[in-house]
Amino acid sequence: NIFYTDLDNTLIYSYKHEIGKAKRCVEIYQGREVSFLTEKTYQLLSELKKRIGIVPVTTRTMEQYHRIDLGIGKFRYALTCNGGVLLVNGEREQTWYEKSLEMVESSKTELQQAARCLERIKDRTFEVRLIEELFLFTKCRHSQIAARQLQENLQLRFADTLTNGEKLYVVPKVLNKGMALQRL
């Protein structure tokens, strides 16, 4: 038996979210405590890990994922970069990654067009990044408006826009957590 779970806003929460006083820090970034886990979630995960495998599935990059320490030991498998990167004992599994690159090939032109459009967005508050050659990421004050503009202007067929607060992603349709779980 395996328990697949997202991390952010499912198991862990940023300092911006109030989750009560019974919590523990699970991520430090640039000397600041930035992500937390409730004590109850910690207890449940600790018990669960003794019984079955747990596989985190996240849009986080490998670097961002490695900053997290839930306090229950490392996981044998994790899916990062929205399922585009499989980690086995903390290391990227190269065959999986190469297959992910093949899968997103049909989206490359749309990603390039989207990057050019994102560069011109005036309320962007962060650089436009191509994450692991798989998808785009940036931050905008009005990410939902920017996502709608991208969809209307580019008529995306092979990629989707996703928003989470000020975060904006342009992700190939074939690169999603559900499909990654099927691959695994």
Language-model features: where?
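Active-site neighborhood of HAD-like aspartate-dependent phosphohydrolases
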Residues: N1-F3, L7-P56, H66
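Short N-terminal helix-initiation segments at or just after the protein's N-terminus
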Residues: N1, Y15-I28, F75-C81, K108-A115, ...
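A short local loop/turn or secondary-structure capping micro-motif enriched for an aromatic residue
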Residues: K21-A22, W96, M179
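Conserved acidic, metal-coordinating active-site core of Asp-based
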Residues: A114-L184
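Active-site phosphate-binding/coordination module
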Residues: L37-D123
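Residue-level "edge-of-site" marker
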Residues: H17, R60, E166-K167
